[in-house]
Curated annotation (Swiss-Prot):
Annotated LCN-type CS-alpha/beta domain residues: 1-62
InterPro entries: LCN-type_CS_alpha_beta_dom, Scorpion_toxin-like_sf, Scorpion_toxinL/defensin
The name this protein goes by in its record: Toxin BeI2
Superkingdom of origin organism: Eukaryota
UniProt note on tissues of expression: Expressed by the venom gland.
GO molecular function, one term: sodium channel inhibitor activity
Subcellular location: Secreted
The keyword Disulfide bond is assigned to this record: yes
CDD domains named in the record: neurotoxins_LC_scorpion
UniProt comment concerning the protein's domains: Has the structural arrangement of an alpha-helix connected to antiparallel beta-sheets by disulfide bonds (CS-alpha/beta).
Pfam families: Toxin_3
Family statement: Belongs to the long (4 C-C) scorpion toxin superfamily. Sodium channel inhibitor family. Alpha subfamily.
Keyword annotations: Disulfide bond, Ion channel impairing toxin, Neurotoxin, Secreted, Toxin, Voltage-gated sodium channel impairing toxin
């Protein structure tokens, strides 16, 4: 049910803070190269070609 994306580095990232990383992780989790990870008002990330990711996100503390 969660729609969050986790950074490949192990850092947890927020869509609101870094859409580029969010998009990169969207690709990493199986989206197409041109797919975009879309943040919504609840802080969820939507990968158009993948669906909701299941890793909870927090503020990026890298």
């Amino acid at each position: 049910a969660d729609g969050y994306v986790k950074g490949k580095s192990g850092c947890k990232i927020s869509c609101f803070l870094d859409n580029d990383l969010c998009n990169a992780d969207c690709k990493y989790y199986g989206g197409k190269l041109n797919s975009w990870c879309i943040p919504d008002k609840s802080g969820y990330c939507w990968c158009p070609n993948k669906g909701w990711n299941s890793i909870k996100s927090e503020t990026n503390t890298c």
